[in-house]
């Protein structure tokens, strides 16, 4: 990271804590006050098309942005909270500039060498965090589409790994894949039931 003399504020958010499959992603964004971006909001309130168009604007007009993730294996080894914080730390570590302050959505933050403030519902309240939520969501959705091409039987293109009826039905039919989170209760219980059936 390069040091700088500007009081740049970096927003950080994650995407994908709840799904049964796929990595958890995080993004960080330093917005440029001279180039405001209209329409920033919590990514969950935006359509896919709006998220995609805002992603292009964020990448084009922000001072800096970066994306990180933690793998399914790391999620199962660390737990989803710690894996989310790891993804955030990785994203921040990729920034080409040093922020003066980091604003993190929620009430947990990674350990960093900069001042950090957690903000509950920050993705709805703070433009930098809104922008980060959008980048994290679109990056994770793109990864789930790539996983769908590898594992089409699970329908990741439809539910992005979340615990829908379609996904649970596919798990019961096809079993657990290498991209499923084995520490998550529905997956863990399915594996236990399969083991009981074999014994």
Swiss-Prot record:
The gene is rnhB. Belongs to the RNase HII family. PROSITE patterns: RNASE_H_2 (PS51975). Its cofactor is Mn(2+); Mg(2+). GO terms for biological process: DNA replication, removal of RNA primer; mismatch repair. InterPro entries: RNase_HII, RNase_HII/HIII, RNase_HII/HIII_dom, RNaseH-like_sf, RNaseH_sf. NCBIfam families: PRK00015.1-3, PRK00015.1-4. This is Ribonuclease HII. Transmembrane segments: none annotated. Manganese or magnesium. Binds 1 divalent metal ion per monomer in the absence of substrate. May bind a second metal ion after substrate binding. Coiled coil: none annotated. A divalent metal cation binds at residues 13-14, 105. Keywords: Cytoplasm, Endonuclease, Hydrolase, Manganese, Metal-binding, Nuclease.
């Amino acid at each position: 990271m390069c040091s700088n003399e500007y009081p740049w504020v970096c927003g950080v958010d994650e995407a994908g804590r709840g799904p049964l499959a796929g990595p958890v992603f995080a993004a960080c964004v330093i917005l440029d006050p001279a180039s405001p971006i209209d329409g920033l909001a919590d990514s969950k309130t935006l359509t896919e098309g709006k998220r995609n168009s805002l992603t292009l604007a964020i990448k084009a007009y922000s001072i800096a942005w970066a994306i990180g993730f933690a793998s399914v294996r790391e999620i199962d080894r660390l737990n989803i909270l710690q894996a989310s914080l790891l993804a955030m730390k990785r994203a921040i570590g990729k920034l080409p500039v040093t922020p003066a302050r980091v604003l993190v959505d929620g009430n947990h933050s990674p350990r960093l060498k900069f001042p950090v403030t957690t903000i509950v519902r920050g993705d709805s309240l703070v433009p930098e965090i809104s922008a980060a939520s959008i980048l994290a969501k679109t990056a994770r959705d793109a990864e789930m589409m790539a996983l769908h091409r590898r594992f089409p039987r699970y329908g990741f293109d439809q539910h992005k790994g979340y615990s829908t009826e379609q996904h649970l039905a596919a798990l019961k039919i096809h079993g657990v894949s290498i991209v499923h989170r084995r520490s998550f209760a529905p997956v863990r219980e399915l594996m236990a039931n399969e083991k009981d059936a074999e014994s």
